């Protein structure tokens, strides 16, 4: 059974849609007669031309547009007067989040990355999922379509990625980056947002972390989060000396944003336990440059080991480079 999907501006009169679940077909009533469908926009940050999932809800956005991003995507992080596109080298995908915060009207705001999507299915999966590329049925397999997205978000306040084991969030950041940067942010929070001190202490000691700067939130939560987040990050950015940093280390604000998101979610859990917060696995796309037949026909596979390795030894981190040197010295392999 195939039904046309109405735009976000239209109402749905007793429309039923089908959702396949194995051999069983479940009929899902999305909205009652006369009710307005909430507007949902999920932005996919792209710093170069890539093959991405896109539809009426999931939209690619060119990030770093002020820095020479020549992609042809209609949405760009320098549209409108209030943007931080010029800070993309330091803020990474957060320039898309800031742009939406200042320029986009919606009821739900979401953020993915051209290689990282959250699945709107497989909620029993407690690890991330690796796929080789964008293939023909990827929207169906991971619920990246309007029907699944609306069904999952109905009544949900915040959709977040599954947490990754890291030892402790404080020590993981210390091993991968300059801990003085995180400590600046934590001091700033203590001084200006003391109501977050409990969440800071709990999350920094937590052995599981939130990563990737991906989530979907209601308008109210999104704006509250952005007011808090960008106040902290701008204070950090204004005092940070970037002159001696390489192209990886300069992405400090983006790295800090991941940790601050975890603090914010922890604060919500502690202070507003009635909020509905749902965890979803992150789908990692390996090849976003082409959709050749062999890629399109390849099914996804779960890879707990790779996801855990990339969290403990993040790509480009000093710890990972140190381990590589040891491996090469012992085995003589590149």
What spans do the regions from the language model cover?
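ER/Golgi luminal nucleotide-sugar-dependent glycosyltransferases, focusing on the catalytic module
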Residues: 2-334
């Amino acid at each position: 059974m195939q039904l046309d999907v109405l735009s976000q501006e239209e109402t749905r009169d007793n429309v039923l849609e089908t959702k396949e679940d194995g051999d069983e077909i479940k009929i899902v009533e999305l909205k009652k007669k006369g009710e307005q469908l909430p507007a949902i926009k999920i932005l996919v940050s792209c710093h170069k031309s890539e093959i991405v999932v896109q539809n009426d809800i999931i939209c690619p956005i060119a990030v770093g547009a002020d820095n020479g991003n020549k992609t042809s995507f209609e949405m760009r992080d320098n549209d409108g007067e209030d943007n931080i596109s010029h800070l993309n080298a330091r803020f990474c995908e957060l320039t898309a989040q800031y742009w939406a915060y200042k320029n986009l009207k919606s009821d739900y705001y979401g953020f993915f990355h051209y290689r990282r999507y959250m699945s709107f299915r497989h909620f029993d999966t407690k690890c991330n999922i690796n796929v080789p590329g964008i293939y023909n049925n990827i929207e169906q397999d991971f619920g990246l379509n309007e029907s699944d997205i609306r069904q999952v978000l109905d009544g949900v306040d915040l959709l977040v990625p599954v947490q990754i084991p890291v030892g402790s969030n404080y020590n993981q950041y210390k091993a991968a980056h300059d801990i003085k940067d995180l400590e600046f942010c934590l001091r700033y929070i203590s001084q200006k947002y003391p109501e977050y001190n409990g969440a800071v202490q709990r999350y920094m000691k937590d052995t599981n972390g939130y990563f990737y700067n991906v989530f979907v939130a209601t308008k109210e939560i999104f704006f509250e989060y952005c007011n808090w987040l960008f106040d902290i990050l701008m204070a950090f950015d204004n005092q940070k000396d970037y002159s001696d940093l390489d192209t990886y280390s300069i992405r400090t604000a983006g790295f800090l944003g991941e940790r601050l998101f975890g603090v914010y979610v922890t604060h919500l859990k502690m202070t507003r336990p009635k909020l509905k917060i749902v965890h979803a696995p992150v789908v990692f796309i390996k090849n976003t440059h082409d959709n050749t037949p062999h890629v399109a026909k390849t099914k996804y596979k779960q890879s707990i080991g790779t996801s855990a390795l990339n969290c403990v030894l993040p790509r480009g981190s000093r710890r990972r480079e140190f381990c590589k040197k040891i491996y090469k010295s012992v085995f003589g392999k590149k």
